Amino acid sequence: MRIGGLQKFSLLDYPGELSSIIFTQGCNFKCPYCHNPELVVPEIFRQPLDTEKVLRFLYRRRRKITAVVVTGGEPTLQEDLIDFLRLIKAMRFKVKLDTNGSNPEMLSRALYYQAVDYIAMDLKAPNELYQKLTRSKVKIADIMRSMEIIRLSGLPYEFRTTVAEDILFGDDLFRIRDLLKEGDRYYLQPCNYSTTLDDLARHRLKSPNLSSEESFQKFKDWAEQHRVLLQVRGE
């Protein structure tokens, strides 16, 4: 495992649980608002943390935390992810996996081996804007397949989208509804623009007040009609 960081304690990242967060190195997307560029750009990768030391740390935290969040970067790019998750599960922790949905095969393996308890998947944009926003070659079929795998898993899950003016907002944001289905839990979250992958983007990024926007109200009305639980984080 290439582990680029460790946050010892969080009350926010796993709903209802006290967790530690493990950040993996490497990502196949290059979203301009990404606030962890040191996990995305190989030229600025830090020396990876020793995996055995991370596991020993978690073992010592068994009475202080109840869960571990594995995020990135993009965790499903790690070839030994499943073995790592199973070692965490063996310590009786709940495991939350964050993913961009680009690797449905690895997601299926994680579920097959019962290595996760909660899945959070980022929805970056409506289908026609995916490659533009992520600045990467994206197979929309993989995104759709990952969403369906997650829905059928029987596990708690969420889909979420980062909102930033000039990048994804208004009617573009509303078109993400085409990816959602009845019963989905969907979060909109403001971008963290203190640090971003794209230095130029940082100077023009703004997190809009969604609740005051007409397009958000339209999205909210649609969600209620289609039984999608739509919530806003950070407001």
Predicted regions, residues:
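Conserved beta-strand termini and adjacent loop/short-helix elements that scaffold enzyme active sites
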Residues: 6, 189-191, 232-235
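Class I S-adenosyl-L-methionine
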Residues: 19, 211-212, 231
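Conserved AdoMet/S-adenosylmethionine-binding subsite of the radical SAM
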Residues: 55-67, 76-202, 212, 219
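A secondary-structure boundary/capping signal
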Residues: 23, 71-73
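Canonical Radical SAM [4Fe-4S] cluster-binding loop centered on the CxxxCxxC motif
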Residues: 14-49
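Short, charged low-complexity linear segments at domain edges
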Residues: 1-17
